């Protein structure tokens, strides 16, 4: 949507050398998104997410990812010049479940923050991807000091001490929008 509105957009993530990875890469490029990690990996498949939407509006998620290409993103894949030229960097916890992708994302967010760029983060806790909630919370806790915009669901509010704690949490970490 950002690229369709004429803004410069990039995607820094690993894709597998498979039908889905090639499709995603081609689609992103067709839509005007610069693919910052253009080499497809043969080491893992492109991670797939399947969403089930129930009649009551609730959702459940199933992932094909053992391992997924997104988990193979490394610090070396992060182009420092692209981060320095960006106006904003967005990341989410989904591909921060394991190293080396966790470290690569932390590095990109810190680099963006240190260079005065806006940083957006989606807690996006998915129980099937993490050992437990505490593991996700521990990783998210490492991110907050770099974040300007925090996306968090009602179910994830305990990560920040509950809804009543949001103003204090924002002040403590310098977050502008939750």
Regions found by a protein language model. Name each.
Residues 66, 94, 124-128, 155:
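Active-site beta-loop-alpha junctions enriched in small/polar residues
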């Amino acid at each position: 949507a950002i690229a369709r509105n004429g803004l410069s957009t990039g995607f820094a993530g690993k894709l597998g050398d498979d039908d889905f990875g090639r499709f995603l890469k081609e689609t992103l490029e067709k839509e005007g998104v610069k693919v910052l990690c253009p080499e497809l990996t043969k080491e893992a498949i492109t991670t797939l997410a399947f969403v089930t939407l129930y009649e009551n509006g609730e959702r459940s998620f199933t992932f094909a990812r053992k391992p997924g290409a997104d988990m193979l993103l490394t610090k070396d894949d992060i182009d420092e010049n692209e981060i320095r030229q960006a106006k904003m960097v967005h990341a989410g916890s989904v591909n921060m479940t394991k190293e080396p992708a966790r470290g690569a994302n932390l590095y990109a967010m810190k680099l963006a923050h240190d260079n005065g760029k806006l940083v957006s983060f989606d807690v996006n806790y998915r129980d099937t991807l993490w050992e437990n909630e505490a593991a996700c919370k521990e990783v998210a806790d490492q991110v907050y000091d770099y974040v300007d915009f925090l996306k968090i669901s009602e179910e994830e509010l305990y990560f920040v001490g509950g809804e009543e704690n949001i103003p204090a949490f924002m002040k403590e970490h310098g977050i502008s929008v939750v």
